[in-house]
Curated annotation (Swiss-Prot):
Organism listed in the record: Oleidesulfovibrio alaskensis (strain ATCC BAA-1058 / DSM 17464 / G20) (Desulfovibrio alaskensis)
Keyword Glycosyltransferase tagged: yes
Name listed for the protein in its UniProt record: Nicotinate-nucleotide--dimethylbenzimidazole phosphoribosyltransferase
Pathway listed: Nucleoside biosynthesis; alpha-ribazole biosynthesis; alpha-ribazole from 5,6-dimethylbenzimidazole: step 1/2
Taxonomy of the source species: Bacteria, Pseudomonadati, Thermodesulfobacteriota, Desulfovibrionia, Desulfovibrionales
MF (Gene Ontology): nicotinate-nucleotide-dimethylbenzimidazole phosphoribosyltransferase activity
Keyword terms of this UniProt record: Cobalamin biosynthesis, Glycosyltransferase, Transferase
Annotated family: Belongs to the CobT family.
Length: 358
C-alpha cells in the first residue's frame, strides 16, 4: 500500500554522509592515481551513501517513467505543435517509435508510459501503459491556477505511487521523463516563481518557435505570474506547483519525492524534469541527496536555473527532446561508477606499488 503525500514528505531520510570517508578510502586504494576517474568517483561515492554502505553498488534494475499531460496554456499560442501531438506521441511511445524507446532499448532500461492528464479519452490497454488521468489537460496558467489543490495532490500521489511500484519491482534507480505540448511554458513559470528568475532571461523556443513567438511566450509567462501572484508570493512550494505546473510535472515531483523516500537514485532529465525537481527540492531539500542531473539542456534557461541552484550536470550534448532521453544516456555513467567501485583491483590485491611505497 502506498503512503500519502504528507507521510512521504515527512519521512524522506537524508543520506548518511558519514559513510563518505569509507567510500573515498576505497576509491583512493584502487589501481589508479587518486581522483583520476573524475566525476565517476563522485558518482560512486554518492551511490555508496545512498545505498547505506551496502556493497556491491547497484544502479540496476532501473526504470524510466515518461509521464504525459496537456496544458490549457497551449491555447495561448506558445507552441508550434497542436495539442493532439501529446496523444499521438503517447501512442508512438507504446509502439517503440520514439527517441526514448530507442535509447532505453540501447542501454537496456525498462520504460513505462503514464497518462497523468492528456486530452482525450482512455488509451488502448498496453503492458507498458499506466492510465491515471487526473483530468484531460490543465487550465491555462495565463487565466488562473493550472490545477486545483486537490488535482495537484492527486498528481503528487500518482508520482509517489509510481516510485513505490518501481521499488516493489526491485528498482535501484528511476529516471524522469515527460511529454506535453507547451510544457516548457509552465516549467519556465515555475523556475521564475521558485528561483526568482526573470522570464526574459530564461524563456526559450521550446519545440521550435520564432523569436516573435518567444517574446509572446515571455509575455504569457509574465501574465501567469501576475495572475497567480498570491501563490507565488506565498512561497508555498505546493501552492506554486498547483498554480503554475501541470499534471505530468506534479507527477514527476511526486516521483522524485517517492524515490528519495525509498532510497533510490534519481536520474533527472532536462528542462521540464528539472522544474519538477525544483518543486520537489523546495518541498523537501533532502531529495538533492538522491538526485543526479543528467545533462544541460539546449533549452534556454536550463543552464541558468541549474547554475542558480549550484548544480553541475553530468554532460552537455545539446539535447532538448525530453521524454527521459538524457536520463537513459546517463544510466550508463551510473552503472560505470558502480562497476569501478565494485570491480577494480586495489593496489594490494593487484600487487601494484602505491606512490608512497615507491
Amino acid at each position: 500500500m502506498s503512503h500519502s503525500v504528507e507521510y512521504i514528505i515527512q519521512h524522506i531520510p537524508p543520506v548518511d554522509t558519514s559513510l563518505a570517508g569509507a567510500a573515498q578510502a576505497h576509491l583512493d586504494n584502487l589501481t589508479k592515481p587518486r581522483g583520476s576517474l573524475g566525476r565517476l568517483e563522485e558518482l560512486a561515492l554518492r551511490l555508496y551513501c545512498i545505498q547505506g554502505g551496502d556493497t556491491p553498488l547497484a544502479a540496476d534494475p532501473a526504470r524510466i517513467y515518461t509521464i504525459a499531460g496537456d496544458h490549457g496554456v497551449a491555447a495561448e499560442g506558445v507552441s508550434p505543435f497542436p495539442q493532439e501531438v501529446t496523444r499521438q506521441m503517447v501512442l508512438n511511445f507504446l509502439s517503440n517509435g520514439a527517441g526514448i524507446n530507442v535509447l532505453c532499448n540501447t542501454v537496456g532500461c525498462e520504460q513505462f508510459v503514464v497518462d497523468a492528464g492528456s486530452c482525450g479519452g482512455a488509451y488502448p490497454e498496453h503492458p507498458r501503459l499506466i492510465q491515471r488521468k487526473i483530468h484531460p489537460g490543465t487550465a491555462s496558467i495565463a487565466q488562473g491556477p493550472a490545477m486545483t489543490a486537490e488535482q495537484c495532490r492527486q498528481a503528487l500521489q500518482l508520482g509517489i505511487d509510481l516510485a513505490g511500484m518501481a521499488r516493489e519491482a526491485g528498482c535501484r534507480t528511476v529516471g524522469t521523463g515527460e511529454m506535453g505540448i507547451s510544457n516548457t511554458t509552465p516549467s519556465t513559470a515555475l523556475y521564475c516563481a521558485y528561483l526568482g528568475l526573470d522570464p526574459a532571461g530564461i524563456t526559450g523556443p521550446g519545440a521550435g518557435i520564432t523569436p516573435d513567438l518567444v517574446k509572446h511566450k515571455t509575455d504569457i509567462i509574465r501574465r501567469a505570474l501576475a495572475v497567480n501572484a498570491g501563490a507565488v508570493q506565498s512561497q508555498n512550494a505546493v501552492d506554486i506547483l498547483a498554480a503554475l505546473g501541470g499534471y505530468e510535472i506534479a507527477a514527476l515531483t511526486g516521483l522524485i519525492l517517492g524515490a528519495a523516500y525509498h532510497r533510490m537514485a534519481v536520474l533527472v532529465d532536462g528542462f521540464i524534469s528539472t522544474a519538477a525537481w525544483t518543486a520537489a527540492w523546495k518541498i523537501c531539500p533532502a531529495v538533492s541527496d538522491y538526485s543526479f542531473f543528467s545533462h544541460a539542456s539546449a533549452e534556454a534557461g536550463h543552464k541558468t536555473a541549474l547554475r542558480s541552484m549550484g548544480i553541475e550536470p553530468l554532460h552537455d550534448l545539446g539535447l532538448r527532446l525530453g521524454e527521459g532521453t538524457g536520463a537513459a544516456l546517463t544510466l550508463f555513467l551510473l552503472r560505470s561508477a558502480a562497476a569501478i567501485f565494485n570491480d577494480m583491483a586495489t593496489f594490494s590485491s593487484a600487487g601494484v606499488a602505491t606512490q608512497s611505497s615507491c
